[in-house]
């Protein structure tokens, strides 16, 4: 079972952030306190491999788990720490067989209907959203709000990471509604000051962890 603290500040790379490359994004996010990284690139090709290896090594040297989005074979090839799978990807069971018992495996579950028909027995966590409006994912499911997120999180058999429109200002609201972690993309990748946003988000996550230890929630 994954330590939920690892999920607290979850950064997902953005391949469409112009000159702010995924590698620079990851460095900025980790400096701000990111505790886990997911590499997401829907148009991945061999020309991206060099940067992917740089990101893997940067994360490894800082003891930050590094996951690949969707692609189990790529995760195995570059010896990533795990993979995150969507509803239309290969199953978590397949990922576990290929990547091994120590791999971190996550799955996207957007609503109660998907939760009812998704086998999470091989997963360490699941991601749910969008909690708030987001422009990063064009085909995102309907916004569920904190209350809708809580409905899914309360029934989940694994820790849940909130995603979608999350900022330093609303991160605590996600934790208070059952999130073990919050995942962000554009709050850092499309920010006017990415380093400042990463720092502020890190502080919000640290505050959430402190309050959880005190027993306020979680």
Each language-model region and where it sits:
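Short acidic/polar capping segments at secondary-structure boundaries
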Residues: 132-133, 166-168
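Residue-level marker of regulatory loop/turn positions in helix-turn-helix DNA-binding domains and
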Residues: 141
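A short acidic, helix-capping loop that chelates divalent metal ions and anchors anionic groups
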Residues: 38, 75, 132-138
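Conserved N-terminal beta1-alpha1 strand-loop-helix module at the mouth
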Residues: 1-90, 97-125, 144, 151, ...
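A short glycine-leucine-enriched loop at secondary-structure breakpoints
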Residues: 164-165, 178
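Short, electropositive alpha-helical surface patch
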Residues: 178-187
């Amino acid at each position: 079972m994954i330590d939920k603290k690892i999920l607290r500040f979850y950064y997902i790379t953005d391949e469409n952030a112009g000159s702010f490359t995924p590698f620079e994004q990851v460095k900025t996010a980790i400096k701000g306190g990111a505790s886990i990284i997911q590499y997401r690139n829907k148009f991945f090709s061999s020309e991206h491999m060099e940067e992917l290896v740089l990101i893997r090594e940067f994360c490894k040297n800082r003891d930050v788990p590094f996951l690949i989005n969707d692609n189990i074979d790529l995760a195995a090839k570059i010896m990533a720490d795990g993979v995150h799978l969507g509803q239309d990807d290969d199953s978590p069971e397949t990922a576990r067989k290929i990547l091994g018992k120590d791999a971190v495996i996550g799955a996207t579950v957007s609503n109660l209907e998907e939760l009812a028909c998704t086998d999470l027995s091989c997963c360490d966590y699941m991601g749910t959203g969008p909690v708030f409006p987001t422009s990063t994912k064009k085909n995102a499911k309907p916004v569920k709000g904190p209350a809708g997120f809580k409905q899914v999180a309360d029934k989940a058999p694994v820790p849940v990471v909130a995603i979608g429109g999350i900022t330093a200002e609303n991160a605590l609201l996600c934790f208070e509604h059952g999130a073990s972690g919050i995942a962000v993309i554009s709050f850092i990748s499309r920010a006017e000051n990415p380093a400042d946003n990463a720092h502020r988000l890190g502080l919000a996550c640290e505050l959430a962890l402190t309050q959880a230890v005190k027993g306020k929630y979680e």
